[in-house]
Swiss-Prot record:
GO terms for cellular component: cytoplasm. HAMAP family: RMF (MF_00919). NCBIfam families: PRK14563.1, Rmf_CrpP_fam. The gene is rmf. Pfam families: RMF. Keywords: Cytoplasm, RNA-binding, rRNA-binding, Stress response, Translation regulation. The lineage of its organism: Bacteria, Pseudomonadati, Pseudomonadota, Gammaproteobacteria, Enterobacterales. GO terms for biological process: cellular response to stress; dormancy process; negative regulation of translation in response to stress. This is Ribosome modulation factor.
Amino acid sequence: MKRQKRDRLERAHQRGYQAGIAGRSKEMCPYQTLNQRSQWLGGWREAMADRVVMA
C-alpha cells in the first residue's frame, strides 16, 4: 500500500516537472488532493528553476 501511494505521488511530481519544462502555468494542475497537488507543484517549481538555469 505504501509503495503504491509513493508511486502515485512520484508520478504527480514528474508530471508537474514536465508541465513546468513545457512552460505551463501552475494553475493547470490537474490534482485536487492536497498531497498530490503539493507534489505536482513541487515538480513544477523545480522545473521552473531548471528553466532559469538553462536559459
